């Protein structure tokens, strides 16, 4: 009888496409469905999803007519307690929280995690039930009317989401593309600036929506148009688009002031600009075939230096900060800024070599990415 020996194999690793199954490391997976590598070792089941805002972002729920269309959501960002979203030509906001205790279908005081961002009275949505309320504290909604608008009262478990409906911010962002955005605070108020590649960049502080067009009464100077990338850096707002080599910036602490005498200006690089990202007190300028970095504090000492003139970024929506570095999609795969600075365009700088076969199949329409920090994950989504 043959001797049988036990061997402990640690299950870890991820998808490996550049090796055949016989030469892959022991414990690596050949096929995973709804599983992911765990930062604690081995594999874990991918968590399910839950709606953050219960109502769909559409004309019916926004009170608009033929404005949102049926295409994809173009923006999803959080500002304070609000979710800011865009679809079609409409920009809107909503707020959500969750129950912190079980509730029966008849209670009229609802205990939640936080009521910040909610009006002092209004309408809530939980499951398929509509609830109105007349008051609130920091963690409760009071005077609730259950089963409003002919909906059916229901009981809810702890952690179930409860949200407002959508409130329209603007409906005139014609022909908008997918948005880039930056959060900033120049004057003691948290704001978000958004750019869609077709309309003027705009800012929003939770209450006031302003076009950054340099117009009389809200700003000055000649504002950039059809901006695709926007980023706040050193108390200036920076604007760029892929059809131009020009990087425009506002006056300090004034995102809608484009007057050179007040400190606004522009910088030209030798390549079409794809995207922007601030990292370690420097502004990285990702171009089609090169990458530059801007340092300094104002127009008096801004300096632009090349990171590489031999390789660029394919899509602005691939740029993310993770693990103390910037990652972006280059022609030869996913790269880090640190690796690119160190060894320029050498192929060894790619971090996606083991899945290059999958990277080569990427379609660059509707590409986007996100970082899941608690899992140390960079996720790239593409059709």
Predicted regions and their residues:
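N-terminal beta-propeller domains
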Residues: 1-94, 166-170, 219-292, 377, ...
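Hydrophobic or amphipathic alpha-helical targeting/insertion segments
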Residues: 180-216
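Residue-level signal for WD-repeat beta-propeller blades
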Residues: 77-78, 84-85, 104, 117-118, ...
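Surface-exposed loop/turn positions within WD40 beta-propeller blades
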Residues: 80-81, 88-89, 189, 197-198, ...
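Surface-exposed loop/turn elements that mediate protein-protein interactions on large endomembrane-trafficking
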Residues: 86, 90-93, 166-167, 201-214, ...
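Short coil/turn segments at the loop-to-beta-strand junctions that recur within blades
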Residues: 172-178, 216-220, 225, 309-314, ...
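Small/polar beta-strand repeat architecture
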Residues: 94-108, 113-179
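Beta-sheet-dominated scaffold domains
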Residues: 235-236, 270-383
């Amino acid at each position: 009888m043959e001797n049988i020996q036990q061997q402990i194999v640690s299950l870890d690793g991820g998808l490996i496409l550049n090796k055949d199954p016989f030469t892959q490391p022991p414990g690596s997976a050949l096929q995973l469905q709804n599983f992911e590598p765990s930062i604690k070792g081995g594999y874990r089941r991918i968590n399910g999803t839950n709606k953050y805002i219960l109502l769909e972002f559409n004309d019916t729920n926004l009170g608009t007519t033929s404005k949102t269309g049926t295409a994809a959501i173009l923006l999803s960002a959080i500002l304070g307690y609000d979710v800011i979203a865009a679809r079609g030509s409409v920009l809107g906001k909503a707020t959500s929280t969750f129950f912190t205790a079980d509730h029966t279908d008849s209670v009229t005081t609802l205990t939640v995690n936080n009521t910040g961002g909610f009006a002092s009275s209004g309408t809530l949505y939980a499951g398929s039930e509509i609830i109105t309320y007349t008051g609130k504290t920091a963690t409760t909604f009071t005077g609730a009317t259950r089963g409003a608008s002919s909906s059916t009262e229901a009981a809810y478990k702890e952690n179930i989401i409860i949200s407002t409906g959508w409130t329209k911010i603007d409906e005139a962002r014609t022909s908008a593309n997918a948005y880039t955005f930056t959060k900033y605070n120049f004057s003691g108020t948290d704001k978000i600036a958004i750019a869609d590649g077709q309309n003027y960049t705009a800012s929003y502080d939770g209450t006031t929506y302003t076009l950054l067009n340099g117009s009389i009464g809200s700003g000055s100077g000649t504002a950039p148009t059809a901006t695709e990338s926007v980023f706040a850096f050193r108390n200036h707002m920076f604007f760029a688009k892929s059809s131009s080599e020009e990087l425009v910036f506002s006056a300090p602490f004034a995102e809608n002031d484009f007057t050179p005498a007040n400190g606004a200006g522009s910088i030209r690089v030798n390549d079409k600009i794809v995207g922007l990202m601030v990292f370690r007190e420097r502004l990285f300028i990702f171009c089609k075939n090169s990458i530059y970095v801007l340092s300094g504090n104002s127009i008096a000492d801004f300096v632009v230096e090349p990171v590489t003139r031999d390789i660029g970024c394919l899509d602005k929506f691939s740029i993310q900060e993770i693990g103390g570095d910037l990652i972006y999609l280059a022609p030869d795969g996913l790269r880090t800024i640190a690796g690119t600075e160190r060894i320029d365009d050498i192929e060894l700088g790619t971090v996606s070599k083991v899945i290059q076969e999958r990277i080569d199949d990427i379609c660059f329409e509707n590409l986007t990415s996100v970082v899941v920090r608690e899992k140390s994950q960079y996720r790239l989504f593409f059709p």
